[in-house]
Amino acid sequence: KTFVEEINSEELVLNGKKRWVGNASLAGLLIVWAKNPKNKNIEGYLVDAKTPGVTVNIIQGKLSLRMVQNCDIEFKNVKIKKSDKLTKANNFQESVSRSLLFSRLGVSLGAVGASLGIYDEAVKYCTERVQFGKRLTSFQLTQTKLAKIMANSQAMLLYSKRMGEMYLKGKATGGNIGMLKAWCTEKARENAMLGRELLGGNGILIENNIMKHMLDIETLHTYEGTYDINMLVAGKELTGINALR
């Protein structure tokens, strides 16, 4: 939890912690959402990363999406100016919900890319691998699993394309995009499982990339809203009943 309080007519003090902030270690400026006890709103502020009291630490030991330096940030009596408040960032829910439409759409397409990467690795391996005097691609079960991965991937791509078109027209809702993100990442997990099975024991080797895709997909399935939360957002729109507690 992060809070901002008034010191005087020109300054505020910021206290709290944030976790899993992407590439914060590289940032010169931080966009920080903090609760204002005075008006009960969660507001957005622009904070210089070098301001005294700001501590940024890279989260170590990640197995997934390692290209992103996720960080813990602590704010301890950080003084900022009232003018550092982002003018239109007065309500976290309203402000972030709009950006989540775009980011969740991007995650869905990321799941498509990972799935197609899995297919490429699997079909290459199964074409080259010979067992019982035959290439793996000549076996029925191999073809069935490859076809399932491709069918899932094509469905994910077309679904994402449709939602992207609705987004550009301003017609996509939070439920539309939430359901898309949840469904695509769920199918991507299935694709990763099938791809790993096709490579047998070799599927766990780094050189074959399947496990890398699998681990990255686990992050896609969780961030920008978990599967359950996104489906509940969709469920609220479908039924008119808010089951989020």
Regions found by a protein language model. Name each.
Residues 1-3:
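Hydrophobic/aromatic beta-strand elements that line small-molecule binding cavities or substrate pockets
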Residues 5, 50-81:
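Flexible, small-/acidic-enriched active-site or ligand-binding loops
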Residues 5, 32-35, 46-48, 74-76, ...:
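Short beta-strand-to-turn element immediately C-terminal to the catalytic PLP-Schiff-base lysine
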Residues 5-6, 22-26, 36-39, 63-67, ...:
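Solvent-exposed alpha-helices and their adjacent loops that cap or buttress functional pockets
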Residues 7-12, 98-245:
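Alpha-helical interface subdomain recognition
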Residues 11, 15-56:
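A short core secondary-structure module
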Residues 76-95:
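Long, acidic (Asp/Glu-rich), low-complexity accessory segments flanking structured domains
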